[in-house]
């Protein structure tokens, strides 16, 4: 996933038509053009090629490599980064509680903290137990590319519930081995997951419903994607493959939390316009916490789950939602400031050969 993210960013910026940017002056345009121009020399790495996050790229590796901020943040920005990190790691609890700033979890939920799914800001894994901790199972039916929530189970199956309420079910996975022959006649074995729903506590799910297991992605570099000018994305639309490069792309326009049409950037089907909406959606659907994006204090509970609405929520007289915009903005800043680590082995001959194929 890291490689895919870096490749997308590199390909996107290397193919920009900077002449269409009216926010750049001539000097800036020329500078951007030189930096993003496609290379024709694949015998050696380009200057600064190892800097996946530009001038702010961090050079730390190891188990905390994905949790580093851009190294060109100011002192004040680093303070905001640490505050956002605290909220990202914060463990939420059910209402009512003496810590009113941390209650409101559920009633149905899949995680109690952002960090639970994005462990050390990295990628999740396929479930090893019946209740996934870093994956969600989307359920419903698709109308073209839009997911229509399931009448009973909502947008995703919730594997946990607060005391006094049944969770929606559990999941078991077994793996089948598949193999294919490489050109050098060596067999490569891959594991193919088959998952099964167990203990559905609110009735069966019809076979016509779509089920999609999603592993939580790592969150490094998302600020770079969020920072791309919408006009640059729109100018690269080529739905009829007019440039004959074999790639047809269509920009997806979605509605943000304020009712405005925006370019879709995040999610499997580019369903989310920015990190603020992405964060708010995750709070409501994954943890059952209301905010200005997802306003239901009962999260993904549906009208058919009447008992779900009998539990207290975390909205109090001093707030209109369980998660304030201030908390959301700190988390968004934290996510936006996570730097991809420095690329390694950029001068390796196999890496350069792969780069040539990619170009």
Question: What is the predicted function of each stretch?
Answer:
Residues 2-9:
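Sec-dependent signal peptide recognition
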Residues 18-359:
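Periplasmic c-type cytochrome electron-transfer domains
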């Amino acid at each position: 996933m890291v490689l895919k993210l870096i490749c997308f960013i590199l390909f996107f910026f290397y193919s920009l038509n900077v002449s269409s940017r009216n926010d750049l002056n001539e000097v800036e345009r020329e500078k951007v053009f030189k930096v993003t121009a496609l290379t024709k020399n694949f015998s050696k790495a380009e200057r600064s090629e190892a800097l996946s996050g530009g001038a702010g790229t961090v050079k730390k590796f190891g188990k905390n490599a994905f949790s580093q901020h851009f190294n060109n943040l100011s002192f004040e920005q680093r303070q905001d980064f640490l505050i956002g990190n605290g909220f990202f790691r914060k463990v939420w609890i059910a209402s009512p509680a003496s810590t009113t700033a941390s209650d409101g979890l559920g009633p149905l939920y899949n995680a109690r903290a952002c960090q639970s799914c994005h462990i050390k800001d990295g990628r999740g894994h396929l479930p090893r137990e019946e209740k996934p901790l870093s994956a969600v199972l989307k359920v419903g039916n698709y109308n073209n590319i839009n997911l229509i929530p399931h009448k009973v189970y909502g947008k995703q199956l919730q594997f946990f519930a607060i005391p006094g309420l049944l969770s929606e079910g559990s999941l078991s996975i077994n793996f089948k081995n598949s193999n294919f022959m490489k050109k050098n006649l060596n067999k490569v074995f891959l594991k193919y997951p088959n998952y099964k729903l167990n203990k559905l506590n609110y009735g069966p799910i019809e076979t016509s419903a779509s089920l999609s297991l999603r592993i939580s992605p790592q969150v490094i570099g998302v600020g770079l994607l969020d920072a791309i000018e919408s006009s640059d994305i729109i100018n690269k639309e080529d739905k009829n493959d007019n440039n004959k490069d074999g790639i047809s792309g269509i920009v997806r326009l979605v509605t943000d939390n304020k009712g405005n049409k925006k370019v879709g950037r995040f999610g499997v089907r580019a369903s989310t316009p920015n990190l603020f909406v992405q964060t708010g959606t995750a709070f409501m659907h994954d943890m059952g916490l209301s905010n200005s994006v997802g306003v239901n204090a009962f999260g993904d509970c549906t009208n058919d789950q009447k008992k779900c609405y009998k539990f207290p929520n975390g909205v109090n007289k001093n707030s209109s939602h369980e998660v304030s915009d201030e908390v959301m903005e700190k988390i968004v800043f934290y996510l936006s400031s996570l730097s991809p680590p420095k690329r390694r082995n950029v001068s390796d001959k196999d890496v350069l050969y792969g780069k040539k194929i990619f170009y």
